[in-house]
């Protein structure tokens, strides 16, 4: 791992409503609480953490493009874009930054349209159904992978 590795956490549409939206699926934590916990975890590991949440696909794509050469690992919860966005997939493949896909709910136990991901087959790993803790596991895994380099 370099002196100060950088990890980017990307969150897709409607995740700004965490804590309000369908808590039976997504839990009671707000996105701010999740990001605060990740920031502390990253700080304790000596890693820089950046975060972006957007309801706009193009903003997530632009953030991925801007990450090239600057970010060492991406953690992404593409939310509904998981099932629709070839563009996000292409952006991630284009910059060739390793990434982990995270979902708060178990997408495989939900509606059939949520079972397909355009990202999973290219991800270093996929974590779903573990709520906010899934982000912490993803960050730990990303840090471990960077340390193994």
Swiss-Prot record:
Enzyme class, spelled out: lyase
Active site: 26 (proton acceptor), 103 (proton donor)
Organism whose genome encodes this protein: Vibrio parahaemolyticus serotype O3:K6 (strain RIMD 2210633)
The protein's assembly and partners: Homododecamer.
InterPro entries with a match to the protein in the record: DHquinase_II, DHquinase_II_CS, DHquinase_II_sf
UniProt-listed Pfam families: DHquinase_II
SUPFAM superfamilies xrefs: Type II 3-dehydroquinate dehydratase
Protein name: 3-dehydroquinate dehydratase
Catalytic activity: 3-dehydroquinate = 3-dehydroshikimate + H2O
EC number in record: 4.2.1.10
Residues reported in the UniProt entry to bind substrate: 77, 83, 90, 104-105, 114
Family statement drawn from the similarity comment of this UniProt entry: Belongs to the type-II 3-dehydroquinase family.
Domain of life: Bacteria
The organism's taxonomic lineage, starting at the top: Bacteria, Pseudomonadati, Pseudomonadota, Gammaproteobacteria, Vibrionales
Protein task: Catalyzes a trans-dehydration via an enolate intermediate.
Positions of the record's site feature: Transition state stabilizer: 21
Membrane-spanning ranges: none
GO MF terms, alphabetically ordered: 3-dehydroquinate dehydratase activity
UniProt keyword annotation of Chaperone present: no
Pathway in which the depicted protein is active: Metabolic intermediate biosynthesis; chorismate biosynthesis; chorismate from D-erythrose 4-phosphate and phosphoenolpyruvate: step 3/7
BP GO annotations: amino acid biosynthetic process; aromatic amino acid family biosynthetic process; chorismate biosynthetic process; quinate catabolic process
CDD domains membership: DHQase_II (cd00466)
